């Protein structure tokens, strides 16, 4: 029995407030097939973007880092806070076009030899 969301979407924000808001909105508008949480790690932006994001999106978990820990370090902070069964690391300048998450989960669950899955990514 899962006591948390199926998926934790984790993204890093470093002076990318607009991009991060667009990502959050695309997740909220497109992902309906699974339960999920969104975690935004503010990687020491000039302005405290975690506070602004939390005010606009109260359901989003925000983490403020006093120092820029880079991509790996920022994601590690997000993963420590994650409650999901699956972790989905996603760049904040990504836009979700469709809900294919359930397909990825189905593949992972039906093939235990698979350790990771990723959707097709197109560059704009």
Locate predicted features.
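Glycine-rich, basic loop-to-helix element that forms the pyrophosphate-binding segment
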Residues: 64-82, 103
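Short aromatic/hydrophobic "clamp" motif used to bind/position activated sugar donors
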Residues: 87
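Short, acidic, metal-binding catalytic loop of nucleotide-sugar glycosyltransferases
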Residues: 25-35
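Conserved donor NDP-sugar-binding/catalytic core segment of glycosyltransferases
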Residues: 98-124
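Short beta-strand/loop segment that forms part of the nucleotide-sugar
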Residues: 35-44, 63-65
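Cell-envelope/extracellular polymer assembly enzymes that use nucleotide-activated donors
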Residues: 6-8, 37
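The conserved acidic donor/metal-binding loop of glycosyltransferases
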Residues: 91-95
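A conserved acidic beta->alpha catalytic loop
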Residues: 26, 42-51, 67
């Amino acid at each position: 029995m899962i006591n948390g969301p199926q998926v934790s979407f984790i993204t890093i924000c470093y002076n990318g407030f607009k991009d991060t808001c667009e990502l959050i909105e695309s997740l909220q508008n497109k992902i309906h097939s699974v339960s999920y949480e969104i975690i935004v790690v503010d990687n020491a932006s000039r302005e405290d973007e975690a506070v602004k994001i939390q005010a606009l999106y109260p359901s989003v978990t925000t983490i403020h880092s006093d120092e820029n820990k880079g991509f790996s370090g920022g994601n590690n902070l997000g993963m420590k806070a994650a409650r999901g069964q699956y972790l989905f690391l996603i760049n904040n300048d990504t836009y979700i076009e469709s809900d294919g998450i359930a397909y990825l989960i189905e593949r992972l669950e039906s093939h235990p030899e698979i350790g990771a899955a990723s959707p097709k990514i197109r560059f704009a």
